[in-house]
Design a protein with these regions (language model features):
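Short helix-to-loop capping/linker segments positioned immediately adjacent to catalytic or ligand/cofactor-binding
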Residues: 92-100, 150
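Conserved beta-strand scaffold positions in the cores of enzyme catalytic domains, especially
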Residues: 44, 70-72, 182, 207
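Conserved beta-strand-loop surface patch within small alpha/beta domains used
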Residues: 1-41, 49-86
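...with weaker cross-activation on analogous glycine-rich loops/strands in unrelated enzymes
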Residues: 126-192, 196-197
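Active-site nucleophilic cysteine motif
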Residues: 97-115
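Glycine- and charge-enriched low-complexity intrinsically disordered segments
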Residues: 194-212
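Short acidic alpha-helical/loop segments enriched in Asp/Glu that coordinate divalent cations
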Residues: 117-129
């Protein structure tokens, strides 16, 4: 982090808790608090060890969330890039998958914000997708986000949620229903719209509708 301490800029190194290789970073909350107690946080500094310093889609999204300027460096080439909040919004379709930043729940939140101007609550994910698969949390979180389960006789409407089991036990994936298709973001794929096929129908365990 970059701090303003008594009028002088100071670099404050923080631990990275992310378990994913070079895909994203998670600043240790304890280090963040220490930095905040040391001075005013005025910027975020991080590296792209194996890629150019140009901001990734995840960088742009996280920069907006942080409301701070970002400084990105490739330590091998010593090239820098600068990024600041500018109102960037990731496209709903074709976005890259990054756990906790642009994943299936992120897509649902962004769709509801863009299409219905509804701000759905975000939920703190486990550090890794593997931890999440051991105890999928979105099903129990949905009830506290304003959704109710559809009755068997109710037909799907645009914007309804489909909780699915994809390749692993438990309802570990969420998709949006839209005009007979689904809009969703599977792990390590680009977000897309595709037909609500027989396979996806078999994967579906619960259907929910926003009720708040």
């Amino acid at each position: 982090l970059l701090l303003n301490v008594k009028g002088k800029e100071r670099y404050f190194p923080c631990r990275n808790l992310s378990m994913t290789d070079h895909q994203c970073f998670i600043i240790d909350p304890e280090d963040y608090v220490k930095a905040d107690n040391t001075g005013e946080i005025v910027g975020v500094v991080h590296s792209h060890p194996i890629t150019p310093p140009e901001p990734s889609q995840a960088d742009k999204i996280s920069c907006e969330d942080s409301k701070l300027p970002w400084y990105i460096v490739n330590p091998k080439t010593e090239r820098w890039a600068y990024l600041e909040p500018c109102g960037y919004k990731a496209p709903l379709l074709g976005r890259q998958w990054v756990w906790g930043i642009t994943d299936c729940w992120s897509l649902v939140r962004d769709w509801y914000k863009q299409e219905k101007n509804i701000e759905l609550r975000d939920w703190q994910r486990p550090t890794t997708p593997e931890e999440f698969l051991k105890d999928p949390m979105f099903e129990r979180c949905a009830w506290r986000t304003g959704f109710r389960e559809l009755r068997p006789e109710e037909s799907l409407k645009n914007g309804d949620l489909l909780f699915m089991s994809i390749l692993n036990p438990g309802l570990n994936h969420v998709a949006l229903f839209f005009d007979g298709d689904v809009i969703h973001h599977l792990t390590d794929r680009l977000s897309c719209r595709e037909p609500y096929s027989e396979w996806l129908l078999k994967c579906t365990g619960k259907r929910l509708r926003y009720a708040s």
